[in-house]
Amino acid sequence: AVRIAQATGAKLFAEVFPRVQRRGAGLPVVERLTYLSEFAQMQIGDATSMVLVDAPAPASFFAYPGKPSSLVPEGCAVSTLATGTDDPVAALEALADHLGAPEDVPLAEASRPELPTGELTVETVAASLGALIPENAIIVDEAQTSGIFNQGATAGAPPHDWLTLTGGAIGIGVPLALGAA
């Protein structure tokens, strides 16, 4: 997907709650759509076409009053390259090859925030996570709105797997943590 974005200039996003995302230093950076619909709309902007790969069209999480449920801009053409019953990786590789997309793509550089001191805030929790996360850690993220800084603070951490909520207030942290152990 990163190769295709490089070749076409497209914006690349992971869905709000990807099942698992391999992240960290030495890996391509794939920005997740933000949980809050107004921020997700800013990320998507005025896109005129959207290609989905093993993901539904972006939608706001709850039916917030006065906010649209669909995050697809009006007039935006939506196409599906591959679904979960297809082989999404093979479909992406075939499209990248068809486009003559470069093999080399930008990778996250190793970087960690300084271990913070002082008041406990969403920013200092994110910085602490980024400073301390070990290689090949499995992070089970149930943060939703308070985790808004986690992605940036951990982007250059050692490679790790990031598991997210199934959506909303449905907690999955304990079962996922037990399964990961």
Where on the chain are the PLM-derived regions?
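Generic structural signal for well-ordered, non-membrane alpha-helical segments
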Residues: 1, 33-40, 44, 84-92, ...
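Glycine-rich, anion-gripping cofactor-binding loops and their flanking helix/strand elements
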Residues: 1-81, 157-180
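Alpha-helical scaffold segments in soluble metabolic enzymes
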Residues: 3, 39-42, 46, 90-94, ...
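Generic secondary-structure signature for well-ordered alpha-helical cores
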Residues: 6-10, 49, 97-105, 131-138, ...
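Amphipathic repeat-derived elements
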Residues: 11-20, 101-113
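A polyampholytic, Gly/Pro-enriched intrinsically disordered region
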Residues: 32-41, 97-108
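Non-catalytic alpha/beta scaffold blocks inside enzyme catalytic domains
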Residues: 62-64, 83-106
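Active-site diphosphate/adenylate-binding microenvironment
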Residues: 106-180
